[in-house]
Curated annotation (Swiss-Prot):
Superkingdom of the source species: Bacteria
Keywords: Cytoplasm, DNA replication, DNA-directed DNA polymerase, Exonuclease, Hydrolase, Nuclease, Nucleotidyltransferase, Transferase
Listed Gene3D superfamilies: 1.10.150.870, 3.30.1900.20, Metal-dependent hydrolases, Nucleic acid-binding proteins, PolC, middle finger domain, Ribonuclease H-like superfamily/Ribonuclease H
Main enzyme class: transferase
Protein name according to UniProt: DNA polymerase III PolC-type
Species this protein is from: Clostridium perfringens (strain 13 / Type A)
E.C. number: 2.7.7.7
Length: 1449
């Protein structure tokens, strides 16, 4: 178009009133014929809005006079614009065209932080996927081009992944994400609806082709498919091929995939619609699939789409704007039948070497999965052989029963051969005889494949060096570079030197009949033996190894490498790894050692040395070999448990070690196998030991083991063997050895995962531990019979069948069906327990209720005592009674947990203070009683004070109306679970007391097993991917994370669990024992199994540590008031739960509507709000709130709603599990039915139709029935009552003894106390509280803890009390104390002064004042940081820096 036309258009446009304020000019037009578009180039001083562009287009169309697409591109007049101005003012314009082409990049380009560094623009974003996409598509170049074209500026652009932005604003965005999903799926549903309408028959060209990807879009009218069948879960039957998930991107359109579902998430919108997200993998990658479920599909889809489903999915691949990655919006889901790997052989093998997730940080498959797979394969048995432990046995036992298969219980132990002397083949040689100390250098590690290149030797006689031997050897092969690097021996140095055939006879002549000595003799002597064998000769000389000699003589050395031993003894070793120098150094070590043994140990000859060494051998320093131990029968199980226990308790050093002599001692009932390449036999074959030596080693084993070649492929990489053929030769050698010795040889997999695909999980776990070869995973999967036959076909058909099938079956047939854990229960026994419990109960009950017991008491007592004694539970009660009595005797109250408070016998035997009888009065004088049996009173504590009408004495008020059935079941035959809260500072004393009760060796801490948690696994996965530069979908990260969870990391102990073995039994009939976390420095011994697996067989006592008894003990010490005498219905105390007025402060002053700060159970923000909502007026109300706050779906979305809407009140809502049974019985439901309904509801199982019908028949209101149906878990009333009793007693001290209350609270509970801040007063506290409250959901756990302390400190100041500053001489180490002017914080209340430092200062100040900061630091051994903290607080005011006096002070 002509320039005149352009000018005319410019004049017309500029006359428009809407545009005349803008400075712009059309510079040219471009006609794009292909798209029928007129591109208009505009130069402008200002940004153009969409409305302004629209007006310009109208003018152009009018001037042209025909219809055409008009595209406006404008650039800014940039005579002096900077890069920063481009980003700040014109960034939207820069990105406009890119976003048109790639809409998904809007989030990255417009909402990401941008940093300018010189000429470089850095765009940071939290989506690794999108950043990778941007860089792959070279979007950075496009941005750079636009900036150059429009602004004339040269720049660099980088789009950078920033992990810190990955979860930013996640919570705020989640709701929007769900709305976006809903919107997207509604569109999909509309499309489906349109597709389902009848359509005209289309031509074959228009029919929809389900080819896995349809990038050209999805034609609604062409969607025509097969009708639904029984495998159709959603939508229609899917025809056509699938594509790999890894090939899907945001441009894939409609795709069809198939795979395994490994996780599902269900989200319900506010409108009640269900969004199902499930994660699916085809093992090329994984992807999230989302679908918005219509009511008609909901039940069917949710019932079928679960973890483990194998299915086919068709839907649209689309970018999820919030997950920031591609997901599939599902239209169709079909169930598929997965073709699994099966063992189709007629005769099946048996796997005898299998690891589970209990092989710590090494294997990735649970025992249950392994046993299930073996059963699916049709195998008659499968062995479980974890590294050093047997912790998978309980799960394996359950799985064996479920799958009807025999499990062979075993372990892959760590053998320490404590039967190998220092001198092999030695007799009575004196230390003054001849010894030849030698060393060799070689081309590699294999005596079979590598060559000797140097021999150096020194001869000793009478303890002195008398001769030497030294020569290079021409290996006739090239010396590897790494050997030259190590030894400095080059090819030129050995070329032309004598060969080994020439050298070896001369060397052996030099040796004569001497004792051969070498450091790590197996290596050097192995090469000599191999070369002598090639010459048809054998080595007969005695051989001494200075490695075990050094371990024996110099036990302080952690490592005994030659250079380290030499350094320790002050012996020169200048050219380490040269044969001559190493031999001389070893000779000097031997000289020194001979002298030491003669002079200090009275050892003068080889025989005495061997005897003393073997009798005092330190197993913890011996080299280890793998060994398989299988239990043949029940005796074998017990002996195996003894071996595992000894390995962990007596011989643990980095690994649980098993001395060979101990295995021999406990060998009865066991089958011993030679294990893998780390076994003693395989190592010996690899080292080239003689046939005689191999037979001696093999004689210890019942069977020999060989494994697939690829299992040991790493030996080729390490240079130990030449190639795969040599690996086969090693297996052949073991097979031939077995045949010669008549020992079965078996082929095993050494399984560490189930299927080939699973190796990725082990790869990640090993990489996370720093293994450099983690990516070179051998195929340690569970092979079928045919797969194993193929692996060993090189042995020949007959031998192959023998090792794979016949011999594995033979070993399996040797094993009986055994029980690693017995089925029965074995309670401890105390002679006369039944009579003792009956007597103490009757004595106590008569002392309270009189000789003629009220009917309600007698009836309850008879029922409970009969159930307890007839079912054998008296001993459990007696144990609990003795523990509580011990604590009370020592001055510490005990709180009961759980439902033990529902047992009246527990109350009368002083196990619990909670009285489960109906509310009542009883006279302490004449024993008259009045019971309230109509349900009008929930707790006796709320009865008004009253005097006995018969004698005038003040009535005792008691009873909380808790049915006995909650604790022992309706028939009274449910095993009681007595949990007790002892003072945390007294807990260890009670634990020790259990040993007094039952005897040492019958009491063990309950063991736990710590596994890789999801968060840790996620960290392993992310680290693995980042280190390798791999970018995968979040769904794939999720899959990898799931695969890495549940793997054992460590062992531990339950905080209060004690397992008790009857004194006529022993622990090895149940499980092995060990130290927690294998800590050899503790005297604590735990069960080897997780306590859950044996808690049904042995008694578990829960002796827990708790703050409340500690608090009450300290309060009693400070005030002299016995907490047991405190009334439970003091009006002022009860008022605290609705108002702070009783504290002398208003809610406006305090900033809180209640006065429950710091009270156990009632001080949290959540419960404080419950108090505001419910306005409790009684002890019973507080019990209900305790129940409501501890249940799941009992308050929120349940009682809270029904109270708010007026259906019920706090008094009548369902709060604890016992409420249901009591209420239904008052409604005239049969007791058994009431109990059954209570049990179902408390476990979250809801109500049956029959239950609902019966309840309605008895006039139970609808809201009550609905409330029952919503409950997931309920708290027992006995537990709630016990908690509230403690809380009310502590609240009493808060009201009436404020100094004691705050002193105690901060001493016992305030771990995060910051004395520096809090001592500044209430204004400083208020300011910090406001700062922390402003953080909202971003507040950290530590900050939450500080906020709680600040709230209580602020309350204290408002009550007129104050804190004194920490004082170096007046403050205690760890306890707050009351002084005349206020409460003095301890030294450890300063952030930066730990408990140990504080205690050290207090101990040292007893010996006099500190004369300087230096004196304080040196005497108390505290750090400079502690000194600075004390100084900053003012504790060291006036104290000089050092001990030196200044002359010029």
């Amino acid at each position: 178009m002509s320039n005149e036309f352009v000018k005319q258009i410019n004049r017309s446009i500029k006359s428009d009133d809407n545009l005349n304020d803008l400075e712009f000019e059309i510079t040219k037009f471009q006609l794009l014929k292909k798209s029928n578009t007129l591109r208009t180039i505009i130069k402008s001083k200002d940004q153009l809005s969409e409305e302004q562009k629209k007006i310009i287009k109208q003018y152009i169309k009018k001037a042209i006079g025909f219809e055409i697409n008009i595209e406006i591109m404008y650039y800014i007049d940039i005579s002096d614009i900077t890069l920063k101005q481009v980003v700040d003012q014109h960034w939207n314009h820069v990105c406009e065209k890119i976003i048109e082409k790639h809409p998904v990049l809007k989030e990255v380009l417009l909402n990401s932080p941008i940093v300018i560094e010189g000429e470089k623009i850095i765009i940071k974003n939290g989506s690794e996927f999108l950043c990778t996409f941007v860089n792959k598509k070279h979007i950075d170049r496009e941005i750079k081009g636009y900036i150059k074209s429009f602004f004339g500026i040269n720049s660099l652009v980088e789009v950078k992944y920033d992990e810190s932005l990955a979860n930013k604003n996640y919570n705020d965005e989640k709701l929007n994400e769900n709305k976006e999903i809903a919107k997207k799926v509604i569109e999909t549903m509309k499309a489906q609806a349109a597709q389902e309408k009848p359509v005209k028959k289309e031509s074959s060209d228009n029919k929809h082709k389900s080819n896995g990807g349809n990038k050209g879009g999805y034609e609604k009218k062409s969607y025509k498919d097969e009708p639904k069948n029984e495998n159709t879960i959603l939508g229609r039957n899917i025809q056509g091929d699938t594509i790999d998930i890894s090939s899907i991107d945001m441009g894939s359109g409609i795709v069809t995939i198939s795979g395994d579902v490994f996780k599902t998430d269900i989200f319900e919108t506010k409108t009640g619609r269900i969004i199902l997200t499930f994660f699916i993998t085809d093992y090329t990658s994984s992807i999230a699939v989302k679908c918005f479920l219509r009511d008609k599909d909901k039940e069917h889809v949710l019932e079928n789409v679960k973890k483990g489903l194998y299915c086919k999915v068709r839907g649209e691949a689309t970018m999820d704007p919030y997950a920031k990655e591609v997901v599939i919006m599902a239209r169709d889901i079909n169930k598929l039948t997965k073709i699994e790997r099966m063992d189709t052989a007629e005769e099946k093998r048996v796997e005898l070497h299998m690891h589970t997730t209990m092989s710590s940080m090494d294997a990735v498959t649970a025992a249950s999965k392994i046993v299930e797979r073996a059963a699916k394969f049709g195998h008659k048995a499968v062995a479980i052989t974890d590294h050093g432990v047997v912790q998978a046995f309980p799960d394996a036992q359950i799985a064996a029963k479920k799958n009807n298969i025999k499990v062979i219980y075993g372990v892959e132990g760590y053998l320490a051969d404590n039967g190998t002397p220092i001198v092999i083949n030695g007799h009575e040689e004196s230390f003054d005889d001849e010894y030849v100390v030698f060393d060799i250098e070689t081309t590699g590690f294999s005596s079979k494949n590598d060559k000797i290149i140097e021999i150096g030797a020194v001869k000793l006689k009478d303890g002195e060096i008398v001769d030497s031997f030294s020569t290079f050897v021409d290996p006739k092969v090239n010396i590897p570079y790494k050997i030259t690097e190590l030894t400095s021996i080059t090819q030129n140095m050995v070329n032309g030197q004598p060969t080994i055939d020439e050298v070896l006879p001369k060397f052996m002549e030099f040796v004569g009949n001497s004792v051969l000595v070498a450091h790590n003799a197996a290596f050097d002597v192995g090469f000599i033996k191999k070369n002598l064998m090639d010459m048809g000769k054998t080595l007969k000389n005695p051989v001494m190894d200075t490695v075990p000699l050094a371990r024996y003589l110099y036990p302080d050395l952690k490592k005994v490498k030659l250079n380290l031993v030499a350094k320790h003894l002050g012996i020169s070793l200048e050219n380490h790894h040269r044969a001559v120098d190493d031999a001389k150094a070893t000779a000097e070590i031997l000289k020194f050692s001979f002298k030491k043994m003669k002079e200090e140990m009275d050892i003068h000859d080889v025989k005495t040395l061997n005897e003393k060494y073997l009798s005092n051998i330190d197993v913890k320093k011996l080299p280890l070999h793998h060994i398989i131990i299988l239990a043949k029968n029940q005796t074998g199980i017990k002996n195996l448990y003894k071996l595992v226990s000894m390995a962990h308790l007596d011989y643990f050093a980095r690994r649980p070690r098993l001395p060979k002599s101990i295995i021999t001692e406990y060998r009865e009932g066991l089958i011993i196998g030679s294990a893998c390449e780390a076994g003693q036999l395989y190592k010996a074959v690899l080292e080239g030991k003689t046939d005689g030596e191999l037979k001696e080693i093999a004689s210890f084993y019942d069977y020999l083991e060989i494994q697939p070649i690829q299992n040991n492929e790493f030996l080729i990489r390490k240079g130990n063997v030449k190639d795969e053929e040599e690996l086969r030769e090693l297996n052949r050698k073991i097979y031939d050895l077995g045949k010669e010795m008549d020992k079965p040889v078996v082929a095993t997999c050494d399984c560490h995962f189930l299927d080939p695909n699973d190796e990725v999980f082990r790869r990640i776990i090993m990489a996370g531990q720093g293994y450099g070869d983690a990516d070179n995973q051998p195929p340690l999967y569970f092979r079928t019979t045919n797969e194993m036959m193929k692996e060993f076909e090189y042995l020949g058909e007959e031998a192959c069948r023998e090792v794979v099938i016949e011999n594995t079956q033979k070993i399996a047939d040797m094993v009986e069906a055994v029980k690693p854990i017995p089925d029965e229960t074995f309670p401890p026994k105390i002679e006369g327990a039944e009579e003792e419990i009956r007597n103490m109960t009757m004595n106590k009950v008569h002392s309270i209720y009189g000789e003629n017991l009220p009917e309600v008491v007698q009836k309850r007592l008879d029922k409970e005592l009969n159930s307890i004694i007839n079912n054998g539970y008296a001993v459990l009660y007696l144990i609990a009674q003795k523990l509580v009595a011990k604590s009370l005797e020592d001055g510490y109250l005990v709180g009961s947990r759980g439902s033990v408070g529902s047992s009246f016998v527990a109350t009368m035997s002083d196990i619990t203070e909670v009285n489960g009888l109906p509310p009542h009065y009883v006279c302490p004088n004449c024993k008259k009683s009045e019971f309230f049996l109509d349900g009008s009173i929930s707790s006796g504590a709320d009865l008004p004070d009253k005097n006995c009408p018969d004698c005038g004495a003040k009535y005792i008020k008691d009873g909380h109306d808790i049915p006995f059935e909650t604790f022992l079941g309706f028939e009274g035959d449910k095993e009681p679970d007595i949990d007790l809260n002892f003072s945390g500072e007294y807990q260890a004393v009670v634990h020790k007391y259990t040993e007094v009760l039952f005897g040492k060796g019958y009491v063990f801490k309950a063991g736990t097993i710590g596994t890789v948690a999801e968060k840790t696994a996620y960290g392993f996965v992310k680290k693995y991917l980042q280190e390798r530069g791999l970018v995968v979908s979040q769904a794939e990260i999720e899959r990898l994370t799931i695969g890495c969870t549940g793997i054992k990391r460590t062992s531990g102990q339950h905080p209060g669990g004690i397992m008790v073995v009857p004194n006529d039994n022993e622990i090895y009939n149940f499980c092995p024992i060990q130290h927690p976390a294998d800590d050899v420095n503790t005297d604590i011994i735990t069960t080897h199994f997780d306590y859950h697996s044996i808690s049904g067989r042995l008694l578990k006592l829960d002796i827990l540590g708790h703050d409340d008894p500690t608090v009450l003990r300290m309060l009693q010490d400070l005030t002299g008031l016995d907490p047991k005498t405190i009334p439970l219905n003091d009006p002022k105390v009860i008022s605290l739960f609705t108002s702070p007025d009783a504290l002398g402060v208003t809610k406006e002053e305090l900033g809180c509507e209640v006065g429950s700060y710091g009270l156990p159970e009632f001080g949290t923000k959540f419960v404080r709000q419950m108090l505001v909502d419910t306005q409790p007026k009684s002890f019973a109300d507080l019990v209900r709130i305790s129940g409501l706050s501890h249940g799941t779906d009992v308050w929120l979305n349940n009682a809270q709603y029904f109270i708010k809407e007026g259906y019920t009140t706090l008094k009548d809502c369902i709060a604890t599990r016992d409420d249901i049974m009591v209420y239904l019985m008052y409604k005239d439901l049969p007791p058994k039915t009431a109990f059954t309904i209570m049990e179902k509801v408390r476990k979250g199982k809801g109500l049956s139709e029959e239950d609902e019908a019966l309840m309605r028949e008895k006039n139970v209101p609808d809201w009550y029935i609905e409330s029952c149906k919503r409950i997931k878990y309920m708290f027992p009333k006995g537990h709630a009552v016990a908690y509230v009793m403690m809380a009310v007693r502590i609240a009493y001290y808060k009201v009436y003894y404020p100094e004691a209350y705050y002193t105690t609270y901060f001493t016992v509970r305030a771990d995060d106390f910051d004395a520096d801040l809090i001592c500044k007063g209430e204004e400083a506290i208020k300011a910090k509280m406001e700062e922390l409250n402003s953080l909202g959901n971003n507040i950290s756990v530590k900050e939450k803890g500080l906020l709680t302390i600040l709230e209580i400190s602020y309350e204290m100041y408002k009550r007129g009390l104050n804190f004194l500053k920490v004082d170096l001489y007046k403050s205690e180490a760890t306890k707050f104390k009351i002084e005349e002017d206020g409460i003095r914080p301890p030294l450890n209340a300063l952030q930066g002064v730990g408990d140990n430092a504080a205690k050290s200062i207090v101990e040292c100040r007893v010996n006099g004042e500190f004369i300087s900061k230096e004196d304080l630091r040196l005497r108390s051994k505290v750090s400079k940081t502690v000194i600075e903290t004390l100084d900053n607080h003012g504790c060291l005011e006036g104290m000089q820096e050092s001990n030196q006096l200044s002359l010029f002070g």
